[in-house]
């Protein structure tokens, strides 16, 4: 009868939670209206410039004027937009696969990971209490975000590592990606111009003055970043050939050249083509906050015969003091018979220090006397005796050498040239235009941090730093001005699969540690504290000093001699020889008697046993080095990312004011930065009159027959257009701030004003809208159209107004249907996107093709948006790796629901409300709340 195959054990899905860490309680977007005035008011943080007399400095245009005053940075509040717990999403899928177990209780427990506040009242007492730690993904200018973290949330001196990957040059589109669907971005392609206000402001402000602006941009951010670093902290700045010399000089100025650690060169996946010589490498400049106290965890690679670090390992120990020189074939690694543990190099046993009174001037070894020459031996007479008895000495000519085995320290420290970090076609899939290889960031973080440490990345991109930090148990904060980048990063983290490494503070970790150390497992209580690290693979680090100081060698030697010496004397008597130990041959001669052969075999057996015992003692007494990139893994478990929040800067424009509430003109800024709001409005109206407002289809374009100023508080212009019946319609034009976000409250006030003035429709023009404004489509009879302005308009004074190009585009509202499935359960279906038809004044629905992803909070409490279900409609599948790992736990049918316009069924919530958030490929977000 055929044996029935045992079912594979199901994998446990777990996550790491940093219970010992905390973060300040900050407001969610929902709580903005109940914040105290002092929490809402802008804070300015001043950073002192470095004393220019301390060392040589790079000079660029405008720097002297900037140095006349401190660097002053606004520190606006941050708002939580979403709370994401990837394990909740996987648990929900597992329940779907098991068909129908209740999800409410466990989800409630998991979302408690975001709380940790002392009382219910503390929810609205912002910046006063500590909550449980959750990682953070923040949309906004890194300069202001870092200042806010330092000043408002007391993170000054708390960050262990910063990985900064600024734009390598000063070209706009080559550094920014316009859509989640394409990495193909070309300068000069109008279709590929990013429309994100945060990015274009950064570009316009930063690169207006070429390399001079670039250096100002870097110095400002490095100054604020330094303030966040712990005394033991490090910063890594990744940069290309074009500006590496300038960036190094700026970092010398900000951090002090005494805190420079290394300039690392690493090979890129592809070269930069030029007419001269191709560039195949980029650079990482590494500085410490304070070199005397910076944290360093050495990185190693295994030694390979014949390569750098092993060229002297050309000898092979055959045992019993016999050795041979390796052949070229053996050195190349082609010989399978070579035991690399017995390969050794002959190292110097002497030092250049002149001999002093008690130093050994001569040492007898195997019947010959050896002197250290003009120097001295590296150890004393007792140490030399231990080396001799340990089989660690070898004469070469008139010199006595130290036998250093490859296995004594089988790794070599990684230097500052990395040729093993390139992304290959079979490794990570690249999703973002300037995505850095994961192995580069991984190595940097592992050298400068421990599990539980905080890592910050001011240029998030596709979220590689966050992904690496999450994998290795580090806490993380990542910042980007690009909505597209954060959309990609969020999907990447939500669907990521990580190995489950054995925690040192766990029962399994204690057992593994005991195996490695040869001791009995500890009985101490365990708490799964990440800060205590993982259990790592380790390698011995046997040194000359440790062998020289090993007194146990004498004990083993003397004990073995009780057997060896009588056998040696007996062998000499049988063969009529006077052999000393080192003279006894390894092989027998044909003319020996049977008794002599037996004695010879017994002696060599005891001799080899003595050496094994001494080798074991040497290994046991030696230090070891952890391989921090090789923790032990529990294959029965799979890990998903821990809880994280998606946040953004204050939705209000932040202006710096003095004590008299007058606007402050920031030093070093040009006149165009301080132009009146009226100038900005006039530029927008001029372009609006020429370009009109475009929707998804050309036939839906609103073309103005006239556009005249209007003296309102919020409405600034009266626009006229005609519908299909040639009836003239009046549109009130509301223009949002040049750098800021329009909120729902802004639209409500503007719509009321439009109704009072008898307009037919309100057209709001803004660079960005908050997610809550998405519900505001109509106020009474007034239809509200939200047009997103093209980022080109930030630079409108430099652009020719041709009326061509979609400068004002409406992202239609998602059309959502709530389906009652019976038994107290409901489903949500995204039907498409609603588009306003100006020719008819009606709304038409298009399909969901423009939607990248959509999320549901199935029990919305009007305090926070929890992502309880997530769906990804694009071609990229963020759950690809998890699907492979969890085949047995979650069936294909359940996985398929993640790429769907219809949600999985869920219980009607006790709160009576659900919230649906929809994100398009440009990173725009809209959120709708429904009563169910």
Stretches with model-predicted labels:
Residues 301-409:
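N-terminal auxiliary segments of SAM/dcSAM-dependent transferases
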Residues 1-295, 305-310, 316, 365, ...:
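S-adenosyl-L-methionine-dependent nucleic acid methyltransferase catalytic domains
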């Amino acid at each position: 009868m055929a044996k029935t195959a045992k079912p594979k054990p199901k994998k446990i899905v777990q996550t790491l939670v940093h219970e010992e860490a905390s973060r300040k309680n900050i407001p969610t977007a929902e709580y903005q209206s109940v914040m105290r005035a002092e929490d809402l008011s802008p804070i300015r943080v001043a950073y002192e410039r470095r004393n220019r007399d301390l060392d040589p400095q790079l000079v660029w245009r405008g720097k002297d004027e900037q140095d006349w005053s401190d660097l002053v940075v606004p520190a606006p509040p941050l708002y939580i937009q979403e709370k994401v717990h990837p394990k909740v999403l996987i648990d929900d899928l597992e329940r779907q696969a098991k068909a129908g177990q209740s999800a409410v209780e466990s989800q409630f427990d998991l979302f408690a990971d975001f709380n940790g506040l002392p009382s219910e009242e503390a929810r609205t007492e912002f910046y006063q209490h500590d909550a449980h730690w959750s990682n953070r993904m923040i949309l906004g200018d890194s300069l202001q975000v870092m200042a806010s973290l330092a000043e408002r949330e007391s993170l000054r001196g708390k960050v262990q590592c910063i990985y900064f990957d600024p734009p390598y040059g000063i070209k706009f589109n080559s550094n920014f990606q316009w859509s989640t669907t394409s990495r193909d971005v070309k300068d000069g392609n109008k279709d590929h111009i990013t429309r994100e206000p945060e990015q274009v402001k950064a570009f316009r402000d930063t690169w207006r003055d070429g390399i001079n602006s670039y250096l100002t941009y870097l110095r400002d951010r490095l100054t604020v970043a330094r303030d966040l670093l712990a005394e033991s902290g490090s910063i890594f700045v990744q940069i290309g050939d074009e500006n590496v010399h300038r960036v190094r000089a700026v970092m010398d100025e900000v951090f002090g050249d005494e805190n420079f650690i290394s300039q690392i060169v690493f090979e890129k996946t592809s070269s930069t083509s030029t007419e001269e010589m191709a560039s195949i490498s980029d650079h990482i400049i590494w500085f410490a906050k304070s070199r005397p106290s910076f944290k360093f965890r050495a990185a190693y690679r295994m030694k390979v015969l014949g390569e750098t670090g092993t060229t002297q390992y050309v000898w092979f120990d055959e045992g019993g003091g016999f050795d041979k020189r390796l052949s070229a074939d053996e050195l190349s690694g082609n010989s399978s018979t070579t035991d690399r543990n017995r390969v050794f190099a002959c190292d110097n046993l002497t030092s250049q220090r002149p001999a002093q009174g008690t130093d050994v001037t001569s040492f007898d070894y195997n019947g010959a006397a050896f002197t250290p020459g003009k120097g001295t031996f590296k150890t004393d007479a007792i140490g030399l005796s231990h080396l001799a008895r340990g089989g660690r000495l070898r004469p070469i000519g008139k010199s006595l050498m130290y036998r250093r085995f490859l296995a004594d320290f089988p790794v070599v420290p990684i230097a500052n040239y990395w040729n093993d970090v390139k992304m290959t076609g079979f490794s990570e899939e690249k999703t973002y235009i300037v995505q850095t290889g994961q192995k580069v960031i991984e190595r940097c973080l592992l050298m400068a941090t421990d599990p539980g440490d905080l890592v910050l990345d001011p240029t998030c991109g596709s979220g590689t730093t966050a992904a690496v930090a999450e994998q290795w148990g580090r806490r993380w904060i990542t910042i980007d001005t690009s909505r597209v980048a954060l959309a990609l990063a969020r999907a990447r983290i939500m669907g990521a699969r990580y190995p489950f490494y054995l925690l040192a503070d766990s029962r399994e970790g204690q057992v593994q540690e005991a195996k490695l150390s040869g001791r009995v497992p500890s009985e101490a209580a365990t708490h799964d504290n990440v800060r205590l690290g993982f259990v790592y693979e380790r390698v011995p680090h046997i040194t000359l000093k440790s062998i020289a100081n090993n007194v146990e060698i004498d004990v083993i030697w003397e004990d073995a001699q009780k057997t060896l010496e009588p056998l040696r004397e007996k062998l000499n008597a049988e063969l009529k020889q006077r052999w000393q130990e080192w003279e006894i041959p390894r092989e027998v001669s044909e003319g020996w008697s049977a008794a002599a052969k037996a004695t010879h075999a017994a002696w060599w057996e005891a001799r080899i046993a003595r050496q094994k015992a001494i080798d074991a003692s040497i290994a046991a007494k030696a230090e070891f080095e952890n391989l921090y990139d090789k923790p032990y893994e529990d294959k029965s478990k799979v890990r998903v990312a821990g809880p994280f929040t998606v946040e953004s800067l204050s939705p209000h424009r932040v202006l710096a004011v003095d004590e008299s509430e007058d606007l402050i003109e920031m030093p070093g800024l040009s006149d165009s930065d301080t132009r009146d709001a009226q100038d900005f409005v006039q530029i927008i109206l001029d372009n609006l009159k020429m370009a009109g407002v475009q929707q998804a289809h050309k036939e839906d374009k609103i073309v103005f027959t006239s556009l005249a100023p209007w003296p309102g508080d919020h409405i600034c212009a009266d626009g006229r257009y005609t519908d299909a019946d040639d009836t003239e319609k009046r549109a009130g034009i509301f223009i949002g701030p040049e750098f800021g976000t329009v909120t729902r409250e802004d639209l409500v006030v503007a719509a009321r004003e439009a109704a009072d003035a008898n307009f037919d429709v309100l057209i709001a023009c803004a660079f960005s809208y908050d997610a809550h404004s998405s519900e505001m489509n109509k106020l009474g009879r007034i239809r509200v159209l939200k047009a997103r302005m093209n980022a080109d308009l930030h630079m409108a004074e430099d652009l020719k107004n041709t009326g061509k190009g979609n400068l004002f585009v409406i992202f239609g509202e998602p059309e959502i249907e709530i389906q009652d499935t019976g038994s107290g359960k409901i489903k949500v279906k995204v039907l498409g996107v609603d588009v306003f038809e100006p020719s008819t004044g009606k709304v038409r629905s298009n399909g969901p093709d423009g939607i990248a992803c959509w999320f549901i909070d199935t029990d919305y409490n009007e305090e926070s948006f929890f992502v309880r279900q997530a769906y990804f409609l694009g071609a990229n599948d963020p759950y690809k790796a998890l699907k492979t790992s969890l085949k047995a736990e979650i069936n294909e049918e359940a996985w398929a629901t993640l790429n769907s316009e219809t949600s999985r069924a869920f219980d009607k919530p006790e709160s009576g409300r659900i919230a649906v958030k929809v994100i398009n490929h440009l990173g725009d977000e809209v959120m709708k709340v429904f009563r169910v």
